[in-house]
UniProtKB/Swiss-Prot annotation:
Belongs to the IlvD/Edd family. Keywords: 2Fe-2S, Amino-acid biosynthesis, Branched-chain amino acid biosynthesis, Iron, Iron-sulfur, Lyase, Magnesium, Metal-binding. The active site is at residue 472. This is Dihydroxy-acid dehydratase. It comes from the Bacteria. GO terms for molecular function: 2 iron, 2 sulfur cluster binding; dihydroxy-acid dehydratase activity; magnesium ion binding. [2Fe-2S] cluster binds at residues 49, 122, 194. Pfam families: ILV_EDD_C, ILVD_EDD_N. It is an enzyme of class 4 (lyase).
Length: 558
């Protein structure tokens, strides 16, 4: 075992006062030579995603002690994307990724911890933990809180997205208030993160693929006993990783990121994975660009039939073999790097050795590579004069991948949603929601409320929506987010005028404002940088520090 970092606070006569304080929190004579392991506990009653995390933290604490480590629990915050969606509060969602990462780094480095076991549930918890691990590079493992089980109504599976879409269905007269209430009461039946292949489940799958959480753990249901057992085993593995000196940057290689992108394409994951993986790679010092997602998309098919665009939820994926089954298919197809290491000290090829080469015959969630849902990945990178740094479109299930239409321009999500619910957005329109980027929002809000309302209105295949903000993992339709440069820093999206012709072409990866160059130059010269919406507080600080979405929207990189 390498020398323990914690010896800086536990060894020598000069550290007697330090030991005195540690004795007050449970250390005994024999404990000062053991590795100190931080357990970053995201427990919160704010959201069902995190409500079960304390039980996992306590199991991990006990397992750490039994394995020969000394656990120290500390709390991290969360912001519920689903609850804050469509409000000013959503501006704090992406910001919380940085706050959580900063908190984990601060606690672990401030207390000279030897390793960290991070437990999270809601969307930003996962990338935040990875950012912190990449910054510190001390042995670490991530424990996902688990997915929620599907709600049931009339024999159909429900997720929280069902409730968002029901709002649009009500406004278009397709359902009444009693039916809306029935969906509301049944959509979220218990603890766990939103149940489709939305952002939380996408990022947990990516972390499992990159080897920083245990096999099968990313698709377990939050309320099933195996979830707590996995938390305990994760603690044991972390103690072993400290002894073997296995560190995050040993695992977060270029090949590991390519594997994560491949799995995300195969399962039909969230657009937010682009932003988060770019941020983690940048922090880890791994060269990765938005163009790499397009390169991998071209060769990796979508083989999982999962919500929001498909039929099944994440517990169904787990029962069909989980992420290891998906990885085995990709590995056998030459689409995965099998030599990447995991926190257990094994290679991916070794981890997958006993996984069947074909998915179970009695399920329809995972398809063989020979019969994919879509021949290419679903996260397309679009470029053009509207997005010189790139934009991201989720095109799985899209019946209209190409649309040229008049721009309907909105300066905020609220303006856009009001127009949709007032039936002021029509088939063929290209909805533009701007000044919602990392700087302009600030915070790059997710546009689930407008997109769900569009679907609920029956316009999901007839309207395109583009934004310098983000989209929820629960979004589907012809939607293009992460448009960069954003409006607030002079991006072309800020020059669009009502009625301009815009082409969104997911097949040719094109996002184009069809206005002649002379007129665009005139508009550019007349453009005035908008005043910051916030000058002080967390959002003011974030807006001053944050990078472009094309670079992961991080706050600690030059």
């Amino acid at each position: 075992m390498a020398p323990l970092r914690s010896s800086a606070i536990t060894q020598g006569v000069q550290r007697s006062p330090n030991r005195a304080m540690l004795r007050a929190v449970g250390f005994g004579d024999g404990d000062f030579s053991k590795p100190i392991i931080g357990i970053a506990n995201g427990y919160s009653t704010i959201t069902p995603c995190n409500v079960g995390l304390n039980d996992l933290a306590l199991r991990a604490e006990a397992a750490t002690q039994a394995a020969g480590g000394m656990p120290q629990l500390f709390g991290t915050i969360t912001v519920s994307d689903g609850i804050s969606m469509g409000t000013e509060g959503m501006k704090y969602s992406l910001v919380s990724r940085e706050v959580i990462a900063d908190a984990i780094e601060t606690a672990c480095n401030g207390q000279s911890m030897d390793g960290v076991l991070a437990i999270g549930g809601c969307d930003k918890n996962m990338p935040a933990a990875m950012l912190a691990m990449a910054r510190m590079n001390i042995p670490g493992v991530f424990v996902y809180g688990g997915t929620i089980k599907p709600g049931k109504l009339g024999g159909c599976d429900l997720t929280v997205v069902s409730a968002f879409e029901a709002v649009g269905q009500l406004s278009s007269g397709k359902i009444d208030e009693a039916q809306l209430t029935a969906v509301e009461k049944n959509a979220c039946p218990g603890a766990g993160s939103c149940g489709g292949m939305f952002t939380a489940n996408t990022m947990s799958a990516a972390i499992e693929t990159m080897g920083l959480s245990l096999p099968f753990s990313s698709t377990m249901a939050a309320e099933d006993p195996e979830k707590a057992e996995s938390a305990a085993r994760s603690a044991e593995v972390l103690v072993e990783a400290i002894a073997a000196n296995i560190r995050p940057l040993d695992l977060l290689t270029r090949e590991a990121f390519e594997n994560a992108i491949s799995v995300i394409m195969a399962v039909g994951g969230s657009t937010n994975a682009v932003l988060h993986l770019l941020a983690i790679a940048r922090t880890a010092g791994v060269p990765l660009s938005i163009d790499d997602f397009e390169t991998i998309r071209q060769r990796v098919p979508v083989i999982c039939d999962l919500k929001p665009s498909g039929r099944f939820v994440t517990v169904d994926l787990h029962n069909a073999g989980g992420i290891p089954q998906v990885m085995k298919l990709l590995l056998d197809g030459g689409l995965l790097h099998g030599d990447c290491r995991t926190v257990e000290g094994k290679t991916l090829r070794e981890v997958l050795a006993d996984v069947p080469s074909e998915p179970p015959a009695d399920q329809e969630v995972i398809r063989p590579l020979s019969n994919p849902l879509y021949a290419k990945g679903h996260l397309a990178v679009l470029k053009g004069n509207l997005a010189s740094e790139g934009a991201v479109a989720k095109i799985s299930g899209v019946k209209t991948p190409v649309l040229t239409g008049p721009a309907r321009v909105f300066e905020s999500e609220e303006q856009c949603l009001q127009a949709i619910l007032a039936n002021q957005v029509h088939a063929g329109d290209v909805v533009v929601v701007r000044n919602e980027g990392p700087v302009g929002g600030p915070g790059m809000r997710e546009m689930l409320a407008p997109t769900a309302a569009i679907v609920g209105e029956g316009l999901g295949d007839k309207v395109a929506l583009i934004t310098d903000g983000r989209f929820s993992g629960g979004t589907y339709g012809l939607v293009v987010g992460h448009v960069a440069p954003e409006a607030a820093v002079g991006g072309m999206i800020g020059l669009v005028q009502e009625g301009d012709s815009i082409t969104v072409d997911a097949q040719q990866q094109l996002l184009q404002l069809n206005v002649d160059a002379a007129e665009l130059e005139r508009r550019k010269q007349a453009w005035v940088k908008p005043e910051p919406r916030y000058r002080t507080g967390v959002l003011g600080k974030y807006a001053r520090l944050v990078s472009s979405s094309s670079k992961g929207a991080v706050t600690d990189q030059p």
